[in-house]
């Protein structure tokens, strides 16, 4: 099918190079608890950072992804989590993004009312209206 390009703008918190020449892309986080496996290894944000790094001159380099987390627990602490992404994981995310974009472009709207962000979301009224109208 037709290949379309889209620009994505964002800010990476920190990019470093280690002694071996690997690129380390770090995302700073604040959380109320330690991160679990899924939060580290399935996070789409750092997958996008890796894709951006590869598209901007780092495709021939080893890329490590890191979360630097300040945990706001009863006794605050700092934890680091390292992860990597495979080509399959990159392509999986690209496919998901394309599929969602195609849906949005076609007028498909499916609210995610299970998110913790829902109560303060700017689109809350649109979601509520969608449910009131029967989801059509």
For every predicted segment, state its role.
Residues 1-46, 51-54:
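Non-catalytic protein-protein interaction segments used by genome-maintenance enzymes to assemble
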Residues 4, 38-41, 51-136:
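Metal-dependent nuclease catalytic regions and adjoining charged, substrate-binding loops involved
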């Amino acid at each position: 099918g037709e290949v379309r390009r889209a620009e994505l703008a964002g800010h990476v918190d920190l990019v470093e190079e280690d002694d071996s020449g690997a690129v380390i892309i770090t995302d700073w986080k604040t959380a109320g608890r330690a991160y679990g496996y899924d939060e580290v290894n399935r996070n789409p944000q750092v997958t996008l950072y890796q894709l951006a790094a590869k598209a901007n001159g780092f495709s021939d380099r080893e890329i490590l992804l890191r979360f630097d987390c300040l945990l706001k627990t009863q006794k605050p602490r700092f934890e680091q989590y390292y992860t990597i992404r495979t080509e399959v994981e990159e392509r999986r995310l690209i496919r998901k993004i394309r599929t969602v974009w195609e849906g949005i472009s076609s007028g498909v709207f499916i609210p995610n009312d299970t998110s913790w962000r829902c109560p303060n979301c700017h689109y809350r009224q649109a979601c509520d209206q969608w449910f009131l109208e029967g989801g059509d």
